[in-house]
Amino acid sequence: MNTRSLAIAWLACLLVLFEVRGGLASFPQLNLILPRGVQRGGERELVFQGARLKDAEQIFFYSSDPFEVRKLEVVDDNTIKVLLMIPDNVSLGEHLVQIRTRSGISEYRSFMVGALPVVDEKEQNGSLEEAQAIDMNVTVHGTCENEDVDFFAVKATKGQRISVDIEAMRLGSYLFDPYIAILDKDRFELAAVDDSPAALQDGVLSVLAPEDGTYYIQVRETSYGGNGESRYRLNVGHFPRPTAVYPAGGKAGEPTAVQYLGDAAGPLAQDIAVRAEQGMMKLFPSDSNGICPSAITFRSSPFGNALEQEPNQEINAANPVDATLSLNGIIGQPGDVDCFKFAAKKGQVFDVECFARRIRSGLDPVINIYYADGRSIAGNDDSRGPDAYIRFQVPEDAEYVIRVTDHLGRGQVDFVYRIELQPIVPSLTLSIPRIDRYSQTRQTIFVPRGNRFAVLLNASRSNFGGELKLDDSVLPPGMKMVAQNMHASLSQMPVVFEAAADAPIGGKLAKFEASHIDPATGIRGQFQNNADFILGPPNNAVYYNGQVDQLAFAVIEELPFQVEIVQPKAPIVRNGTMQLKVQLKRAEGFKEAVTVEFPFRSPGIGAGSSIQIPAEQNEAVYTLNADGNAAIGTWPIYVIAQGNTPGGPAWASSQLATLEVAEPYTNASLARSACEQGETAQIVCTLAPNKPFE
């Protein structure tokens, strides 16, 4: 990937983006954690940088690993130092954290945990003659300035494995696309890479030393860009660094024999324990020379494995398999095609999911389904991003063939894939819609004492319908939730959280769930969030993100204002308007203007994006309108107010009020008439009552 040509324009856009965000950002704010990674097995100090951190009290860890905060020191409003105890059994790789202060919850950011001791890059090291000598089995913390090239020298004996794994884009802090190479003493490249699918847009390498001697590791930005923010963690050692695992998944809760592929020392066979929880899991292969510093992705699912057997290139040579098993194979050389044959009965429906890029394989899969005689039924390339997906409705009792190959006809020894014929099952996911496309503003629940906070909650139903209810059992002490059940016709609902005046200040991460109104269905789903960590050209494309499955809750200190909706006593009618009165209760001394939003609009209801309650005034009117097809009924409504306080921007919501939408009481029709300019005229209006007035 070449990024230098767009670097100047992108930096300018980035500065504008940060300037815009600054006015909307939630408080407190967490921008960066330094160093970007630490070695497990002891106490480590991390510096959290951001804004409005002076009242920091707690660090939320999204993993279940046994981190222990030994000390939290506030340096100033923009910096805190955290002394962490990181035991030897903490998981390697990325860990997501955020800060709870007495006034709010920050964004979540990442830091890395490694197994190797850390050394710092030392300049000057811009040539082979100046290469920084390092031991094997270390992690180098370095920075690439503009047009900078860093060299590191290591010793190896003939046949020893030299493995290199760089974490740069995966650090999630800056658009730095690294290039790495391994050179011999004569400056010849033994291996080089820009992007490795196993490491996203970072690179991994492993070679066997051809002779005793000194070898050089080169690090630079792929197009010789870089600046002081272009940080990296360079893992160098004798550890295994495969690029794929085969098979790429196993049956949940059962042991599975696998082979790690793509390592210079050859395939590594191991038995692994597949976790009982379904989904993607991380594997860290190890041998007598160490442990792989970053994960190989592996899928835990309800299905056992069927492994391809060559030859299976043609439909008439397809491997016979049971449709209850997952289909595993490798597109091992250019032009390779794999075919599997299975029996199915008319009326069966399968979600045919091909996992390749989602498990970080380099394969860009294309799948097709045929009758066993070769007649085509369906095909797909990219319905799951680069991965393929087909919903297959079996047309008759028969045998069918699934064919898989690479979109460009490529093939490599690590182009693994896994195809699952999944039965149609219901699923449910909750999320909070973004109010700012690239930020985490108001993606957490922070409720001021004696006040309220509200969010819109999205529910993504798949393969089912029906009413949903939320589970409020996970809330912190002193906090309660006010929400109606979500009607089957809706995918979004308002939820108000209230904190008692004496609620203890504190917070937690929790699995926030919803369920079908009928417990017999067993349908449940939980909150998930996906934050953009690195954006870049073109058009603010997302290069790296962070995903979590817990929601952060906190009770925070009191605010100097409260907001209320004056409950409407009459309905809004179709093709009509309503002046919704909003009242502001100010604490003594608080005179700032407050911005009020009306986030939830039932079908057919419109409103402006916001209104202002001017400084030193206590109420305003929000104009609502209903179109001719507005949904009839009684709907929940709320407003949320933002005001500037000495601690930064703050939010409070109103109570959950109701808005009735009704048919007009009368219809009016005007008769055609005419008059001369400057004259008066009478116009006949005919009223037709729709329902009696009360």
Task: Kindly give the residue locations of the regions a language model identified.
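Short beta-strand edge segments in extracellular beta-sheet folds
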Residues: S110-V118, R233-F239, R275-E277, T297-N305, ...
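Bacterial N-terminal signal peptides
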Residues: A9-R21
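Surface-exposed, proline-enriched loop/turn segments that connect beta strands in immunoglobulin-like
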Residues: L32-P35, V245-P247, I432, T441-Q443, ...
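Short glycine/proline/serine/threonine-rich loop/turn segments at secondary-structure transition edges
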Residues: N89-L96, G226-E229, Q278-L283, G411-D414, ...
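Acidic, Ser/Thr/Pro-rich low-complexity intrinsically disordered segments
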Residues: L24-V69, V75-T79, D88, R102, ...
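Extracellular/luminal low-complexity segments enriched in Ser/Thr/Pro
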Residues: V82-V90, Q259, D271-V274, L456-S460, ...
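Predominantly extracellular/luminal regions of secreted and cell-surface proteins
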Residues: R109-M136, N289-T324, S427-L430
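Beta-sandwich strand segments
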Residues: Y108-S110, G226-R231, G411-V416, A520-N530, ...
